[in-house]
Amino acid sequence: MQTQHREGGAPAPDTRSGADDMIRVLPRRTVLEQPAGCGDDPCPPPSRPQEFRDWFEREGYVLVRGAIPPRLCQAGIDAFRAEVLGDRLGFFERHVSGKFERHQYTPGGYMKYPIMNLQDLASRRHAGFRRAGLTVLTHPAIQRALTVLTGEAARCVHTMYFDGNQVTWAHRDGHYIDSRNDGEMIGVWVAAEDIHPDAGRFFILPRSHRMRVPGEEGDPNSAQYKARMADFVRDGPLDCVAPVLRQGDLLMWKSMVIHGSLPTTDERWSRRSFTAHYVPLSHPYKWNVRSAQSARSLRFNRVEVMLHAVDGTRVARLRNHVRSEWPRAYGAARALWQGLRPGA
């Protein structure tokens, strides 16, 4: 279900500095829709559990067609468009910066930078989107597939929603967040709509979880890391696979598999999708780019979902409440504070 018209009115200019320049790194020229030598949809289904697990362990990813009912995917899109896309005052936690920022829009009018941690959306204005997104990401089909892969139930530690395409750099999730048992976290990506080839498809390097990239140690947010990963994708020995993904399709991958997104070549197209990361219930999780992890969680659809909002003090709780419910006042106060800081 694609839309070609612009949404959200005239797009606000993207005022982010040149940070994007260093992440717009292209994968190799030959991008495959399935692994070389395979026919269409080579991945075994979860109903063949041993083959499903063997493929996942060997290739590092697996694709489940039609896992999520289209009506639930569409409900998530509709709630986003009704409650979030046009909210020009609201502050949302962003993937690239890790900060709470207002929307930036693509030339096609889509939200450029994805929202992180839907479970932490506190405003009543966004309650429908929060509920619809978590309904998709905790769906029983996902839980069944996770149980087949891990042998136990799993805990959701992180969520995201994409509307437009920020062009995510090639990376390993495990360099940012993972299970305490390194490499045991599983990523989940649900296509909320049919993803057009020109929208910037998700790409993955099968079997990359078994290979090291020279110089990949260090800060995974640095320009050097992103350049080394880009070089490996472009010039390394592994295929770059960007599967055709349709509404309701589910892609799952190991935390040390290299993946990212292709650049958008036609700004008319969105790439609406929901993402989550899961660890087995018997495993603690860890942040590799944050000083501490939250111990708080909620239960949704019988699934434990970790909360990450920093609200350990009265001041933090007050700040979060003002940011959620009175974003105009919060924005004015933040601008004033930043103007008063030394060196501003």
Question: What residue ranges belong to the model's regions?
Answer:
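Non-heme Fe(II)/2-oxoglutarate
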Residues: H5, G9, R16-D41, T106, ...
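Non-heme Fe(II)-dependent double-stranded beta-helix
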Residues: D14-R58, R65-H171, Y176-D178
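Extracellular structured ligand-interaction cores
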Residues: Y61, G183-W189, A199, C240-A242, ...
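Cytochrome P450 catalytic domain signature, combining two hallmark sequence patches
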Residues: R81-R94, R212, P220-N221, S294-S297
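Short, structured patches in soluble enzyme cores that scaffold and shape functional sites
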Residues: M160-Y161, R172-G174, V190-D194, P206
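Short edge-strand/loop segments of extracellular domains
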Residues: G164, L205-R212, R271, H277-H283
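Short, conserved beta-strand element in jelly-roll/cupin
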Residues: R180-P197, M252, H277-L281
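Double-stranded beta-helix
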Residues: I195-G260
